[in-house]
Amino acid sequence: MNFKIKTFFSIKSNKIFYTDFYFFLKKKLIILIKNIFPEYFNFNNKYKNWNLICLYDLLYFKVNNINFLDNVQYINSLIKIFLPLKFQNLKTNKVFFKNLLIFELPKYNSYNYCYLNGLKKIFISKYFTSNGIFFNKYLKRKYNIYYAKLLLTNSNFFNIILDLKLKQIYLSIKNLKFNFILFLYYLGIKNTDILKYSRYKNSKILKLLIFSALQTDLVNNKKIILKNLNYLKSIFKLTILNKNYKNFIISKDKLNYNYGDFSKNNLLIIDFIFILDLLLDLQSKKLCFKTIDHLDNKHINTIGNYFQHNFKFYLKKFISIIPNLIKLQKFSLLKVYNFKELLILNPLIQYLEQINSFSELMHKYKLNNYNSFSKGILNLREICLNQLGKLCLIDTTEGINCGLVVSFAKHIRIYKKGIIQVYFSSIFKNKTKEFLNFKTSLDQELYLIQFNNINLRKIKYLMNVRLVYNKNNFRIKFFSNKKSILLEFTDLFSFTENLIPFIKYNDPARCLMGAKMQSQSVPLLNKKKSFVITGYEKEIITKSDTTIKALQEGIVLNASSLKIHIKDLFNREIVYYLSKYKKSNQNTIIHQKPLVWNGERVFTNQLLTQHQDIIDSEFAIGNNLLFYYGNFCGYDFEDAVIVSKRVLYQQLFSSLHMDIYEFNFCYNNENDIEFSTLEIPKQSYYIKKNLDSLGIIKEGEKILTGSILLTKIKVAKPTYTYKSIFKLIYSIFGKTIRNIKDNSLYIQTGKSGRVSKIELFLVNISSRHKYKTYNNSYLKCRIFICKQRFLTVGDKLCGRYGNKGILSYIAENADLPFLQNSFYPDIIVGALGIPSRMNLGQLFEALVGKISFSYNIRILPSFTTSSNLYFNYLKILIYNFLMFNNFKKGFNWLYNFNLPGKFIIRDGRTGVKLKSSVLCGVSRYSKLIHLIKDKLHFRTTGPYTEILQQPLKGKKNLGGQRFGEMEIWALEAFGASYNLKEILNYKSDDCFARNNLKEYLLFRNTELQNSTITESFRVILKEFNGLILNLELFLITDDLEENYLNLTINY
């Protein structure tokens, strides 16, 4: 009987994170407070003795919403934890009860995120090594040394190392070593007990180890024995001579499964003898061991475990400040200890990526394996065979954290205690039978994992030969009806990689880049479904939390653009509110539309809404473009992209973004106050035409660069040194002179758009309702500006295969080369990026997309087309299909017998047939969020770093433009040599040319010289010199003898 991975609704179970968080608050928090908080406190205050008693069992919670002034997008829900305290006067026996506010925590919902300052934050999972016993080896003096690592529940560990070359076995704790036989002697185990319970009692090796320990004088010296006992007590923090180690709580099911003969309860003294036998088994190669990095030995950390671990640290600090928190005279609270730094500064709690619904889903799928010790360990970064079906083999971060931050596979579930589960369904004679649940990966080792779509031969007799994986090894076996797991090709990856149609024909590094680019794509206004699909476009929407799904079956009573009203089977009315023009964390717009109508019957988990990147319940974030691989006037240099104006006119890559402006009106006293008015000095009526009577921009107005958003004037009395001058001015003009300061808010360059909403909040400053504000503000204004970004030169376009480039030129349609059927291409891409990056998949997508474009159909290619039949079957299938349809009427341009898959094109300007042929097809392209308007800013002179002499980063620091590799290629394609020279030399780290240009512009007393060598190139020369390599440059002179002169480098 075989088993196949089962697809089910909930993949990564957010319910485990949600329930574990509240289980910690209800159950574990009380136990934690009892262990750390003392039950009684004594206070002395002005001749009064007070006794404070903590009532742990009366601990309660209260959920409140933060004031609306702090809610930018959503309502912030807080959980307040109160600890009741009992105050008793020891003299008068007077009793008071007060509730002490310990912590304020954000409320986590069932989708595993919370709200902080109105913005979504998510907890990134992290997996740790479970407590237990792990065996490993290392090479020392060309000899394998085996050791056992015991990891305890209190994060302490020690090693038992067997070194037969030195004829001893010793215990290593915190870089200190002493004999393991002597350690057993301290525990009360005699040598006769070791020989009695050990399986090697008749071997010479064990007797030799015992004899080497007895040779030392440590056994007979009582002072050394007492010293070692005290040292062991300080480390383990328990009575060493106990026969049962209650602190050594280790999961025995894994140990008994792997090695057997362990006791059922906690670690006993006899188990140390069994560990000694296992080390001798490994030395004699009678037993194989699992490494500590095996996925069996890991568990996922949930949000409840995270708070439980950090509460211990903060509770201990909280005890020390309790006397300062409570005034015994008034019995009131002074302040609450700040616990929010745990939520703001911790790298595991991040702002949710909301570029599109796909990026939000994949952000929840991240898994962190980073700690302070894993940065230089290469074993943690490698792909282990036990990760098949559980962790994605490709998806990871780039840079120094490569391999440390990975992603879950598509069909996994987090079970209790952080165990990863994969669900399977049994298959017998190609029919699905009963449902089977593998609780742990230990059970998976009882079955053979088959890659059923990988055939090794074309001969029919050998078609049943399968590649099988079992117990960390690959084998080749004949197919049988024994228990086996049929692992599909798509089950090895996450959803990001499964959106790439022909992933098998690409380089894995480019597939990773293509997956990252899809999660960074911006939702478009005029988007279309892709012609070539994988079948996972609809499945992503069912897994995503960005859409609204029906909680109960029922009938729609009312469906509008604001809410959906449904009556369920129990005659209950459920209202779903839609998100309308809300800003995401990455400044994109979240806008939901209803999918149901009045009177429709809906079922559980049915989609009720769609948003900005969904078409007909399917993920669609790009457009299908007709393109060809070639060149056009050199504008396609390297990865630069050329686009026709038809794409710009039809707004195929136009997107919406939103900015939020917040500002306060402050006051110091009655005479020094900020206010808004239409009568601002030195401004014309043309500038103030979009303002209302209060001096605030009107809703729906179009604002450009330099427009006024809000007028803000501060009036204060001027200060005079001589009062006589003040009286003279008052007698002449009849009015007092006021000092008016204009603090109006103007739109910066690149921030133009349309005002969508304005919010005004009046802060109540009365004595009854005090609200603590910054800078004594009495009024808060919030303006929402919606921006429409068109496709401009400098934006990034990308495909699904990691093929991305900077838009370098927007050409006229009539100037571009056209095909035989008078079709003009939408985009032109350089052809050199395919063979150098081994992206054969995008060639297949171009040909298949051309077929689907011609017949107006959508094609779902199988991942296992060539594997089930023979190699090159997919290429032959596509060519035969093109040739077959070539004979139909109107499709004779699809296939050229002389040039299969290619087309002959003509110049659009002259109509002359070009010599070379090009590969033309239809592929899906999308626009990345790295827009040129956000990156480009003006910078004449600015600060530089002292050591590297590079411009500082960021607009706030007046830093340089972030010109990368592809931006330089776009400038080179356009032939902008002077701009390129200015960016790479004068605005970069060429110190000599920079100083020469400054003196030339300021003083005009020096000539403008050529640019010299940059500082970064000088660093490379120094590194070459460190490798005993010398780099010299030569110039050819104009002499008739053609002598070479050495060019000196100033470094």
UniProtKB/Swiss-Prot annotation:
- Can you say where in the cell this protein is located? Plastid, Apicoplast
Q: Which InterPro entries has this protein been placed in?
A: DNA-dir_RNA_pol_su2, DNA-dir_RNAP_su2_dom, DNA-dir_RNAP_su2_hyb_sf, RNA_pol_Rpb2_3, RNA_pol_Rpb2_7, RNA_pol_RPB2_OB-fold
Question: Which EC numbers characterise this protein's activity in its record?
Answer: 2.7.7.6
- Judged by the first EC level, this protein's enzyme class is transferase
Alphabetical GO CC annotations of the entry are:
apicoplast; DNA-directed RNA polymerase complex; mitochondrion
Keyword Plastid present in the record's keywords: the answer is yes
SUPFAM superfamilies recorded: beta and beta-prime subunits of DNA dependent RNA-polymerase (SSF64484)
Q: Which domain of life is it from?
A: Eukaryota
Assembly and partners? In plastids the minimal PEP RNA polymerase catalytic core is composed of four subunits: alpha, beta, beta', and beta''. When a (nuclear-encoded) sigma factor is associated with the core the holoenzyme is formed, which can initiate transcription (Potential).
UniProt lists the family membership as follows:
Belongs to the RNA polymerase beta chain family.
Write the protein's name: DNA-directed RNA polymerase subunit beta
Per the UniProt record, the source organism is Toxoplasma gondii
Per the UniProt record, the lineage of the source organism begins with: Eukaryota, Sar, Alveolata, Apicomplexa, Conoidasida
